[in-house]
Amino acid sequence: DKIFTVQIAAVISAKQADTMIGHLKKRGVEGLYIVKGLQRSGGYWYKIRVGHFPSKDEAIAYANRLVDSKLIKNYFVISLPKK
């Protein structure tokens, strides 16, 4: 079984990630979190993700609402193993 999350950005500093999350929280977006991952060239990506959804369709519907509200420009849905 899998769950789905929406990645809305990937930035190269924790400060950028925190700023973006702060802005989105002020606009009412909940369930945001950061995943820190290594870049191939060294350094880190700070991947900003939101939500855990039982289906890909629900994740897409939520992400499309964020796009329609002009809160994000693009996204992609990621499947994760259920814990």
What role is predicted for each listed range?
Residues K2, I12-K83:
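Extracytoplasmic
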Residues A9:
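Conserved beta3-strand ATP-binding lysine motif
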